[in-house]
Amino acid sequence: MPFLELDTNLPANRVPAGLEKRLCAAAASILGKPADRVNVTVRPGLAMALSGSTEPCAQLSISSIGVVGTAEDNRSHSAHFFEFLTKELALGQDRILIRFFPLESWQIGKIGTVMTFL
């Protein structure tokens, strides 16, 4: 069950319509998870600085069980997400940062229990 949070200082009118759905589909493909398990939040218009600059930028946080736990996996994931984000947001790679957070099944609650028991 991946969780993706895309924060950007781009104003909402510069974020392509439907980005959350395309990011959901891309994440499902990149991470090898069913799209109906992917959760995406897009937050435009934030006060942000990346590398000391307030020029347009974005930060993607990816949390998931089992697929973001190794440097090798994340190197591959990073390449694919950078390709997606540079196209969608028209930002250079130096203006995007990705953070990976491995989760355990007991850290996600769903339908009154945690994923461990589902």
Swiss-Prot record:
GO terms for cellular component: cytoplasm; extracellular exosome; extracellular space. Its main location: cytoplasm. The modification N-acetylproline is found at residue 2. It comes from the Eukaryota. Gene3D superfamilies: Macrophage Migration Inhibitory Factor. GO terms for biological process: melanin biosynthetic process; negative regulation of macrophage chemotaxis; positive regulation of ERK1 and ERK2 cascade; positive regulation of inflammatory response; positive regulation of tumor necrosis factor production. The keyword Cytoplasm applies. The modification N6-acetyllysine is found at residue 33. It is found in: Cytoplasm. Highly expressed in the liver and at lower levels in the heart, lung and pancreas. Keywords: Acetylation, Cytoplasm, Lyase, Melanin biosynthesis. It catalyses: D-dopachrome + H(+) = 5,6-dihydroxyindole + CO2. Pfam families: MIF (PF01187). GO terms for molecular function: cytokine receptor binding; D-dopachrome decarboxylase activity; dopachrome isomerase activity; phenylpyruvate tautomerase activity. Its EC number is 4.1.1.84. PANTHER family: D-DOPACHROME DECARBOXYLASE (PTHR11954:SF22). Homotrimer. Belongs to the MIF family. Tautomerization of D-dopachrome with decarboxylation to give 5,6-dihydroxyindole (DHI). This is D-dopachrome decarboxylase. It comes from Homo sapiens (Human).
